[in-house]
């Protein structure tokens, strides 16, 4: 977007503000002074490294007048963010997205801008344009980017009234921005823009002082996208990139990307026969092949035994449930866009459901409404209470009453409503609490096709789901137990580099359910348990769900990427919605507290992550093929088969390579197939009842009696030794699957 644009409208503000620095000291500044001015007063060196500022927890431009962001007492609690601050990198990348968009608009004609947010590892910008961009175009785009960076032009913020903002975007032929102003900003009265040279973009910011702060930038890939994620909307081109304050950091990050490609679970999964995605079955629906299924069974058996020993009760629930149950839980229609359409026992059910959805979106013309009424009558459905002149809510109510009298089902999007029904299936006493229910339950999400990614993002996923129903007094101990369980599970598979994110409520918000007393108790209990555990954790006020605080384990893999695994979530909402009760020791009825927890998250995503973490080379206890017996020749096949039988009876996953060829080739094939151990046998071993054991990692271990080999290998399995993953050195944790923020 290119234009001359007005400055921000003047606002009434005090002539001076008091700036409170992190050390508690106060500085008096003119209201039109900026954080950069404060930095310059301290030192020119500091000013050169200032990227943005943090004011009372909110990141703002370093060049924004302090009077605009002072509190009611004209005080500005200010923290300067420099290139060393982690949050400053996000600001840099946001500005890099603008610079990239500016470069693309210089090169190509007819470019309509969508959104350009940051992601966990970089940024992207979506474009609607006549020409197709490919990775072959990246060099010329990057060359133009470098010209913009070299010019060091400043970013400037200005604010317009909504009508003025719409006119500006209309004048610039930016129809997507016009649509967003008209439909995407609610009742927002003003709109902020940023200008850099000839480029102007609607944006909430913040941005770096000038483009010259971008010391390293790289375009990474191009993909398809939809306007606002709506598959029925306009198709866009999405260009991804990343940026850093230092060229060495970029080089390290690019090496991390290359290493991630070498470990791609989709490639390794196909190469080693672990899983498959078949379009005839459906995108996002995993077929677990025998080797992958063995890994899954091992994980399930491991966790099942552990849960049973910790007082959990197994349950099973169906793959579908009545829509009314999900209306009670709130999952429907709130999460409808990410769910498969309801299943109906009547042919006309789908018609009425689509009809209701159109009314809900206020997207039904009079002609279409008449056609729907006629179509329903064709199926024998008459709706005498349906009045076209009534409000949409009244019309939806008529349709809903018809639906209530006919069976409607959903593919299960969550296990928790089913578990609530299991709790409520019989009277409960405080003596039965805590009640811990667990299930490896498969749920279904209608993810967009473009978001699907092997096992990492799927439409059918099996969660290691458990729900604990307890009293308020039991929350602390149950939380401690779930934290210990999650630690145990993660460390058992070699994931010992993690931190915990504790999501708390916003004390200034009233959106939360449950009493303030319960929230205070729960948050204090969670914080206390984490402090006592010695775990590294950070608190995130305002990040709690409306129904309770939670703790997420953020696990770093061997190449430095961070994965959200292992969630513990308190819930005051579902027990209330389902009217769950237990009789207390006071003989009165009470609501239980519900705790959701899943150490794996989903077996698909967890297994996919392990494939990449171990580069397909699973530790012995998880491996789908632990031992391969290699006979030296046909004469030794009979003995090899006998050895394999003994190993199988000892509980190992074992195969025999009875193919023709030299043993060196068989060893090489076993190494390629990532088999943990090879047992080489020939006439000498047959005569002495031994095997020549070979470790995939350490090589030849020499000959030994079969019983000795079995004892050695059993110890490795029983202790769940992990020797495969090699820690990598990376510049930062790149979060996987971070949510982008529009506008």
From Swiss-Prot:
Keywords: Aminoacyl-tRNA synthetase, ATP-binding, Cytoplasm, Ligase, Metal-binding, Nucleotide-binding, Protein biosynthesis, RNA-binding, tRNA-binding, Zinc. It is found in: Cytoplasm. Its main location: cytoplasm. Zn(2+) binds at residues 416, 467, 596. Residues 13-76 form the TGS domain. Its EC number is 6.1.1.3. GO terms for biological process: threonyl-tRNA aminoacylation. One of its GO terms (cellular component) is cytoplasm. One of its GO terms (molecular function) is ATP binding. It catalyses: tRNA(Thr) + L-threonine + ATP = L-threonyl-tRNA(Thr) + AMP + diphosphate + H(+). Pfam families: HGTP_anticodon (PF03129), TGS (PF02824), tRNA-synt_2b (PF00587), tRNA_SAD (PF07973). It comes from the Bacteria. Residues 1-30 are annotated as: Disordered. Residues 264-619 are annotated as: Catalytic. Residues 1-15 have a biased composition (Low complexity). PROSITE patterns: AA_TRNA_LIGASE_II, TGS. Binds 1 zinc ion per subunit. Its cofactor is Zn(2+). Residues 354-404 are annotated as: Insert. Catalyzes the attachment of threonine to tRNA(Thr) in a two-step reaction: L-threonine is first activated by ATP to form Thr-AMP and then transferred to the acceptor end of tRNA(Thr). Also edits incorrectly charged L-seryl-tRNA(Thr). Homodimer. Belongs to the class-II aminoacyl-tRNA synthetase family. This is Threonine--tRNA ligase. It comes from Rhodopirellula baltica (strain DSM 10527 / NCIMB 13988 / SH1).
